[in-house]
Structures are given as structure tokens and as C-alpha cells.
Amino acid sequence: MKKLIPIGADHAGFELKQIVINHLEQKGYELKDFGCYSEDSIDYPDFGHPVASMVEENDNMLGIIICGSGNGINMTANKHQGVRSALCWKNEIAQLAREHNDANIIALPARFITEEEALEMIDTFLSVEFEGGRHQRRVNKISC
């Protein structure tokens, strides 16, 4: 069975989202594309909330969100209980977000990273496991 990954982006992240979808489908993943579906200007919360809701409702699911800076869509996702969205701009940050913070959504800043950097971070994010241990204690303190 293919691993299902929800993905969403605003207009600034549309092109990168399409590249990510193609990359992951070639690797055998199934993507649930919540949009957007063009470069027409839209509002990032309309695409961040559905991804975050799906991750929130499904244990062990990982999601991908993209906007211009990554900030707005990341803030949107983190409003959901149980979602730990990490804004990543370097591969090491994506790795540590999973290993130490049990991040379940990666947020990417489309205007500030290359396609190659994005794909490397996503591959890392999807392959790295949470270390648990002392990190679990810290993650348990995140939710309000």
C-alpha cells in the first residue's frame, strides 16, 4: 500500500508543489492535493488548514505545505491540536524537526529555496524517524 501524504500550497508555492508531487509519485507515494491549482493569488490558510486537519485526524501521517516565506502556512497548520509543523530551509533542520521534535508537517518557503533543496528536505523529512527518549518528554509539553 502506498503511503498517503496530504499537500497544499498557496500561489507562491504552486510551481514547487507540482514538482514535489511529481517527485513523490515517482517514488511510489500517493498524494492528496488540497491545492491551489494555479498561480492565481489566493489565501494560504485555505490550503494549510485542510492539510493540517488530515494530519490531525490520522496518527503517523506526515504532510507538506508550501507558501512564499513558509511562515503564514506554517502558523496556520500549527493552530491544529496535535500538529507540529516545522518551517524548514535547510536539510539539517528538516532532519532535526523529525528526529527531535516529531514534526508531522514540513513547511517550505518557496521563494527562498531551490527545487533541489526542497526535494532533499522532503526526502529527509519522510525518511527520518522520531528518536523519542528525552525528546518525547519535550514534545509532550508542546500542546496547550
Labelled PLM ranges:
Residues 15-26:
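Short, solvent-exposed amphipathic alpha-helices that sit
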Residues 30-41:
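A short beta-strand-loop structural module common to alpha/beta enzyme folds
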